[in-house]
Amino acid sequence: MKTAAVVMRSPEDLCISSLELDAAGDSDLVVDIDYSGISTGTEKLLWTGRMPTFPGMGYPLVPGYESVGRVVSAGAHAKHRVGDAVFVPGARCFGPVRGLFGGAAARLVVADERVFDIDASLGESAVLLALAATAYHAVSGGGKRHPIVAPDLIIGHGVLGRLLARLTVAAGLPPPTVWEREPARHAGAMGYEVLQPEADSRRDYRAIYDVSGDARILDTAIPRLAKGGEVVLAGFYAEPLRFDFAPAFMREAQIRTAAEWQRADMLAVKQLAESGRLSLEGLITHHERAEHATGAYRTAFTDSACLKMVLDWRSCQ
């Protein structure tokens, strides 16, 4: 069984290829993908070649961890059934080609326990669930740390920053301030204010959440903290982070790293989205057929007006 898939052969060398899929086992599903999202964080680092080395890293690879589709075959031990709408956070099913994280393909073979059933009415917006779960994890800490202070300042008004702000408002907490340097990204706020950093004079923030991925952000954020305040690093940083110690010492600043989402985070945001408490509207700005993936990835990574690019795989099946 073959599938069309996005393959990064090396940095900035991307194509659609026909790949042989691994055989499905008794606990596996075969899923036909309708839509997949392009990540401007992790996938951009893979595309540019700036991704820090980690176990399993290497080219060629199939990217993607934001895919939605329908089950077309289910193993005897699988709980999902044919016809179920599911979210797939990636797969490793391409033989010698690495899945990092393997979601950008027309068809996937994936372990039943790895996927999440979704309300089909979410449609293409369901590709945003991984980012929503990432935002949720930043403020929930996987339920392993209490208390966690919700953001009163968010740095970055991309999709992750918007979802973090929307989750804060949906929880009934005071609306956060959001910093964004790109004027074109100031639009789209839902119940909170977006400012240029220079227009904000506050220096008493209790919790600053950075989703910009700017490795120089600590020297910008720490002087804006109240004493005992916290900076949460919720982006992904390709370069080493450094900071001036004296301002951090004077404020007794805390620095916390938020890692990848866990299953409980996904279940929580799925319920919020399906109930309508968390809006996913207005976040997908660009669409492209999967056959045109080369141009779509370049647009996603170079056009500041592109918040989220979605590939449509339906014509490839």
What are these regions (language model features)?
Residues 154-157, 169-220:
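Adenosine-nucleotide cofactor-binding segment
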Residues 215-277, 313-317:
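Glycine-rich phosphate-binding loop and adjacent beta-alpha segment
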Residues 37, 75, 91, 212-213, ...:
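Short glycine-/small-residue-rich Rossmann-like dinucleotide-binding loops
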Residues 22-38, 50-92, 121:
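Glycine-rich beta-strand-centered segment in the early N-terminal region that forms part
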Residues 35, 89, 209-211, 313:
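Short, well-ordered coil/turn residues at beta-beta hairpins
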Residues 161-162:
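N-terminal Rossmann-fold NAD(P) dinucleotide-binding loop
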Residues 86-155:
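NAD(P)H dinucleotide-binding glycine-rich loop of Rossmann-like/cofactor-binding domains
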Residues 1-3, 219, 263-317:
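C-terminal hydrophobic helical "lid"/dimerization subdomain
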